[in-house]
Amino acid sequence: MNIGVLGFQGDVQEHMDMLKKLSRKNRDLTLTHVKRVIDLEHVDALIIPGGESTTIYKLTLEYGLYDAIVKRSAEGMPIMATCAGLILVSKNTNDERVRGMGLLDVTIRRNAYGRQVMSFETDIEINGIGMFPAVFIRAPVIEDSGKTEVLGTLDGKPVIVKQGNVIGMTFHPELTGDTRLHEYFINMVRGRGGYISTADVKR
């Protein structure tokens, strides 16, 4: 099982580190920095990390990955998108500078939680996982969750949603040290639906 992390910008290494922690019990797991279409062709799943959404968008266009990711998703490739990654895979970004891929039927408002100095961490309850420490950094807000399945909310707003083979969240699970969401994604890749036994997961 080869999981790729889109490697242009943002929390690329942090996602890699979380997956490496899980490789001890997933010995078939290999990791790839995805920067070219040929890289994408060799992965079974993709993580699109947080960072700066306009920069990531421009680079996916420049390197031909935008359309390639949409195509692979339509073919069933699982995708995990965090913060800026969620903006990229959304249906409506509310930002003319970033054309969403339409992989999640959500409407997004960028930087809705304020500037970086106003970032925060709080516990949220996620279906299939339980209480989880969520780190919000200039996070977007999901204004309309459309046809997605809402897995968790904060103050009545969805913060993590799933639709088919794509899961997206407004926060940064890679910054917590808690590997459960990455294990959830690995189980999605394995076709187990994502749900995990929290008793089996070491934080």
UniProtKB/Swiss-Prot annotation:
CDD domains: GATase1_PB. Belongs to the glutaminase PdxT/SNO family. InterPro entries: Class_I_gatase-like, PdxT/SNO, PdxT/SNO_CS. In the presence of PdxS, forms a dodecamer of heterodimers. Only shows activity in the heterodimer. It comes from Thermoplasma acidophilum (strain ATCC 25905 / DSM 1728 / JCM 9062 / NBRC 15155 / AMRC-C165). This is Pyridoxal 5'-phosphate synthase subunit PdxT. PANTHER family: PYRIDOXAL 5'-PHOSPHATE SYNTHASE SUBUNIT SNO, PYRIDOXAL 5'-PHOSPHATE SYNTHASE SUBUNIT SNO1-RELATED. The gene is pdxT. Its EC number is 4.3.3.6, 3.5.1.2. It catalyses: aldehydo-D-ribose 5-phosphate + D-glyceraldehyde 3-phosphate + L-glutamine = pyridoxal 5'-phosphate + L-glutamate + phosphate + 3 H2O + H(+); L-glutamine + H2O = L-glutamate + NH4(+). L-glutamine binds at residues 51-53, 110, 137-138. NCBIfam families: PLP_synth_Pdx2. GO terms for cellular component: cytosol; glutaminase complex.
